[in-house]
A protein has these predicted regions:
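Acidic, glycine-rich loop-and-beta core segments that form the ion-binding/anion-interacting portion
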Residues: 325-329, 335, 343-361
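Surface loop/turn signatures of beta-propeller and other carbohydrate-active proteins
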Residues: 23-35, 66-86, 109-151, 170-173, ...
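Hydrophobic core segments of beta-strands in well-ordered, beta-rich domains
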Residues: 47, 98-101, 149-169, 191-195, ...
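Bacterial Sec-dependent N-terminal signal peptides
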Residues: 1-23
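Conserved Ser/Thr-centered positions that define the repeating blades of beta-propeller domains
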Residues: 61, 183, 242-243, 291-297
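Beta-rich accessory regions
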Residues: 22-67, 87-89, 94-107, 126, ...
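Structural motif
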Residues: 56-57, 109-110, 173-177, 234-240, ...
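Beta-propeller domains
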Residues: 55-64, 141, 157-158, 162-194
């Protein structure tokens, strides 16, 4: 029936491939935008976006069938930015057209008058030159479009692979796809495209990837195998595999491989468990985690669940991770379960909590009492934390989404939205009878420093503060905007006040003072400043705090009250 309808639609508009591209208006909300064969030879069709416009639902038709579908806020009366629809996706196809339904109350003449029709244009290039004052220099960001959770992190052959929740057709959440970037140093990243795109099973939500060294899946030795959530009416788990180091993926013909009617059933994270010689997977299901095992990554056995009555339950549990690590200064090894939660964070919105205990491949047992909640980062803007598979030397390298669901869609950027945290190496330490997660900047951040240190604050730098007792650190600019950080040695707390940091009117939830326990004294703070973010970490790993800031001008002044001394390194 769909094929007959599309054929009739094309015939109604008098469409042939020889016509120049044009819009034919079929009803108050319906248009067919035809693309000539000549135009298909160009690189991309630039779609004009207006962020406060109604959503348009676009189906790409070729050879009398639907080959792609996505949503975009086509410009109504002005253009905020353009996004590309790349023509190479449709190479060799004929009869290409966009079947467009624009939501909203339009008469036929009103639809015809929208700005988008005259602004759509073909181009042999898409300009990715940065136009944003707040885009960071040494944090990963998408060149354009929206990004949230990091996904499918793995290391192979000297390359760090970062996939991420991505909207290629706008800078707000929509059209969930896996974007892909690579790096050789965890600091400088190169965008590699969108290797896992939505399909008939659903849009592509969060998941993980592993290097299958022993070919347990049958996809080939050292194949990269990804599990992700297919989001449709229900959320199910699907698989894709790569035999070219993660550049391209083939979706498994047996998808979905795990189904459920449970809402919020998502974000599979898998890893090889040497203790049981099997794969384990941890999966978020509402407000608890489910644990599975497998011999081949395709067939999964339910083992147990964890989380009822443990930790914070102020929101949905998401983006889990589970890993074994040594406890600093002891001969102990413990397992840590990461559980991202939204809402329910210590200062509102989203945050990363974790649990420490034992895991035998079948069941996770938490060491702490159920009412104990531990946070990995005490800022407002650190979420969806996950680690890289196959990291060298047994390291547990983590990256997070650097934003908060309370305002992520409204922050004052348009070309792109959201970045990732700096990479951090995780570990464990003991303090007063509890075991906590240690978080330190990855050594790659030290390697990125300039050779010489100075006192001048720049908009993208690392500030190292050596402390001897209480200290107050203030970053400010000529506009009077400032961020105040305070360390109280006696109380064992560190706080950051961004209530006068700059632009805040985009959300009532942005202004905040965040406060963290330090689990003992801090002798050195490492503060990473990168245009629109401040990450403060104890050099020994006992405290981490991440907050976004949007000063109208860069902070160019620093004062340290107390006995602390500081140095500033540029990050290259």
């Amino acid at each position: 029936m769909k094929k007959i309808f599309i054929s009739a639609l094309v015939a109604l508009c008098g469409f042939t491939a020889s016509y120049a591209q044009q819009a034919s208006f079929l009803s108050n909300n319906h248009c067919l935008y035809r693309i000539s064969q000549e135009s298909q030879n160009q690189k991309c069709l630039l779609l004009p976006v207006q962020e406060n416009a109604e959503m348009a639902n676009i189906k790409v038709i070729a050879d009398n069938k639907q080959v792609k579908a996505f949503n975009v806020k086509l410009a109504k009366d002005h253009v905020d930015y353009f996004v590309p629809l790349y023509m190479d996706e449709f190479a060799g196809l004929k009869g290409l057209a966009l079947d467009i339904h624009v939501n909203g109350d339009y008469n036929k003449e009103g639809l015809n008058a929208l700005t988008c029709w005259k602004e759509m244009k073909f181009s042999d290039a898409f300009d990715m030159k940065n136009r944003e004052q707040y885009r960071p220099d040494f944090h990963h960001t998408p060149a354009y479009g929206w990004m949230n959770d990091p996904n499918g992190l793995f290391y192979k052959d000297g390359v760090w692979n970062l996939y991420f929740q991505y909207n290629p057709y706008g800078s707000q959440w929509e059209n969930m796809t896996w974007g892909h970037s690579t790096s050789t140093d965890l600091v400088h990243w190169k965008f590699q495209g969108t290797p896992i795109q939505p399909d008939a099973v659903g849009t592509i939500f969060s998941g993980s990837a592993v290097v299958d060294k022993n070919n347990t899946s049958g996809f080939g030795k050292d194949a990269v195998v990804a599990l992700y959530t297919s989001a449709a009416e229900n959320q199910t788990q699907s698989m894709a595999y790569s035999t070219d180091n993660g550049k391209t993926f083939t979706k498994y013909e047996g998808n979905p491989i795990i189904t459920s009617t449970v809402p919020d059933f998502r974000d599979p994270h898998m890893f090889w468990n040497e203790g049981i010689k099997k794969w384990n997977m941890i999966l978020a299901a509402g407000q608890h985690m489910e644990i599975y095992s497998s011999d081949n990554l395709k067939d999964w056995k339910y083992e147990s669940s964890f989380g009822e009555k443990y930790g914070n339950h102020g929101g949905v549990w998401e983006c889990p991770d589970l890993m074994k690590m040594k406890v600093r200064g002891t001969d102990k090894e413990k397992w840590m379960l990461i559980c991202n939660i939204n809402p329910g964070g210590p200062f509102g919105g989203s945050a990363t909590q974790y649990f420490v205990g034992d895991f035998d491949g079948h069941k996770f047992t938490c060491d702490s009492k159920p009412e104990v909640t531990k946070w990995m980062d005490y800022g407002k803007d650190h979420y969806a934390t996950v680690t890289f598979d196959n990291a060298p030397e047994g390291r547990r390298v983590a990256i997070a989404w650097m934003s908060n669901w309370q305002y992520a869609n409204q922050v004052p950027t348009q070309q792109y939205r959201s970045g990732n945290s700096i990479p951090r190496d995780l570990g464990l330490f003991e303090y007063k009878g509890e075991t906590y997660c240690s978080v330190v900047p990855s050594p790659e951040m030290t390697a990125a420093r300039s050779k010489k240190a100075g006192k001048k604050l720049t908009e993208s730098c690392e500030m190292v503060v050596n402390l001897k007792g209480n200290a107050t650190i203030t970053l400010s600019n000529d506009k009077g905007e400032k961020v105040v950080m305070n360390y109280d040695a006696k109380a064992e707390t560190f706080s950051m006040d961004r209530t006068k940091s700059g632009k805040m009117d985009f959300s009532k939830d942005f202004a905040a003072v965040t406060k963290a326990p330090t689990y003992g004294n801090i002798s050195q703070l490492r503060i990473f400043i990168d245009k629109s973010s401040i990450e403060a970490l104890d050099a020994d790993g006992k405290m981490a705090m991440t907050n976004l800031v949007f000063p109208s001008k860069p902070y160019n002044k620093v004062t340290v009250k107390g006995k602390g001394k500081y140095q500033v390194y540029d990050i290259k």
